[in-house]
């Protein structure tokens, strides 16, 4: 039963006298319900993390764009991945930071679904780009003689565009379907972002087919890309172990190690969050998992790539004027 007498900010009852549905003007992102001093601490912590994430990924994207020696397919993919990370973290964190200092913590109906759309679309584009990067590594190590003829600049650009386009089309239909569903009061989403799991709890009518559709799409994009990456690196590992030179094996492992570390970091948190849709997870744990994937993963990705890659470190030193920081 929907509480007809409950008055909640942002809800307008339908004119029909016996209707229990409501038009939602806005949602309330509850976030972390804690004392004001802790809210200030979290705001400072996440603001610093956000600034470091933007700086790190921005530095890598800028350096790869400036240094013509790094205008190769591998670094073009990496530069686009860093650029994607900037937009991905910016799709949710700024609003989250505002809510830490706000008493109302509201977000408009359109704003909520736009945040949902960009958060999932950019995340899907990242998954696809990680898969393309694994394919690039496979060609470079397993098919070195054919690599220059296959992975041309033209194909590289096409693959990047394909990742962006497919990423933004993948969750378009679910977003439209969810936005058309009727809601009942209250309009409080017990989360830090507009996530589909807590949002489904506000529906007046159960929609298991739409939920199954959303989770199926999430599972397909996660497991499909993950299995392709595992398959690519299985072939890469077989080729590397067959190399007669220890120097060649070490170089190949160092090249693939950074990408594998990023893949492990991204997919481990993704599988926990969206393959098992909140079953057995407390609300607080779901918030922490989302924060980890939305903020911590983009923060560490540039560190992983820059610390393991001599070419990127050299380019950063050149751009920053041979600083001792790097």
UniProtKB/Swiss-Prot annotation:
Lipid bilayer topology: Multi-pass membrane protein
Disulfide pairings: 112-194
Matching CDD domains: 7tmA_OR11G-like (cd15913)
Compartments (UniProt record): Cell membrane
Gene Ontology MF annotations: G protein-coupled receptor activity; olfactory receptor activity
Residue ranges annotated as Cytoplasmic topological domain: 66-72, 134-158, 238-259, 309-326
Residues the record marks as carrying a glycan: 13, 18, 106
UniProt keyword annotation of DNA-binding present: no
Keywords carried by this UniProt record: Cell membrane, Disulfide bond, G-protein coupled receptor, Glycoprotein, Membrane, Olfaction, Receptor, Sensory transduction, Transducer, Transmembrane, Transmembrane helix
Entries under InterPro entries matching the protein: GPCR_Rhodpsn, GPCR_Rhodpsn_7TM, Olfact_rcpt, Olfactory_GPCR1
Topological domain ranges for the Extracellular compartment: 1-44, 94-112, 180-216, 281-287
Listed transmembrane segments: 45-65, 73-93, 113-133, 159-179, 217-237, 260-280, 288-308
GO CC annotations on file: plasma membrane
Taxonomic superkingdom: Eukaryota
Function: Odorant receptor.
UniProt record similarity statement: Belongs to the G-protein coupled receptor 1 family.
UniProt protein name: Olfactory receptor 11H12
Gene source species: Homo sapiens (Human)
Gene this protein is translated from: OR11H12
């Amino acid at each position: 039963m929907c509480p007809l007498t409950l008055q909640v900010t942002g809800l307008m009852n339908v004119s029909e006298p016996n209707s229990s549905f409501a038009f939602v003007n806005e949602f309330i992102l509850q976030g972390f319900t804690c004392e004001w001093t802790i809210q200030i601490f979290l705001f400072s912590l996440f603001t610093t993390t956000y600034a470091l994430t933007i700086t790190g990924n921005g530095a890598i994207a800028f350096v790869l764009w400036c240094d013509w020696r790094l205008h190769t397919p591998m670094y073009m993919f990496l530069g686009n991945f860093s650029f994607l990370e900037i937009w991905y973290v910016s799709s949710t964190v700024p609003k989250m930071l505002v809510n830490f200092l706000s008493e109302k913590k509201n977000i408009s109906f359109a704003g909520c679904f736009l945040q949902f759309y960009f958060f999932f679309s950019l995340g899907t584009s990242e998954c696809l780009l990680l898969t393309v990067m694994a394919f690039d590594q496979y060609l470079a190590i397993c098919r070195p003689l054919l690599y220059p003829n296959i992975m041309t600049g033209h194909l590289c650009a096409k693959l990047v565009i394909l990742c962006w386009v497919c990423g933004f089309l993948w969750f378009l239909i679910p977003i439209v379907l969810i936005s058309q569903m009727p809601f009942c009061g209250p309009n409080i989403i017990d989360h830090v972002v507009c996530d589909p799991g807590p949002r489904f709890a506000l529906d007046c009518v159960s929609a298991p087919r739409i939920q199954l559709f959303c989770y199926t799409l999430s599972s397909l994009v996660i497991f499909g890309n993950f299995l392709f990456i595992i398959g690519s690196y299985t072939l890469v590992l077989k080729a590397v172990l067959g190399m007669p030179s220890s120097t060649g094996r070490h170089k190949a492992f160092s090249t693939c190690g950074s990408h594998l570390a990023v893949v492990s970091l991204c997919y481990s948190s993704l599988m926990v969050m969206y393959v098992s849709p909140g079953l057995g997870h407390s609300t607080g744990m779901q918030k922490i998992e989302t924060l980890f994937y939305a903020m911590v993963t983009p923060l560490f990705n540039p560190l992983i790539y820059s610390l393991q890659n001599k070419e990127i470190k050299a380019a950063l030193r050149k751009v920053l004027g041979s600083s001792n920081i790097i």
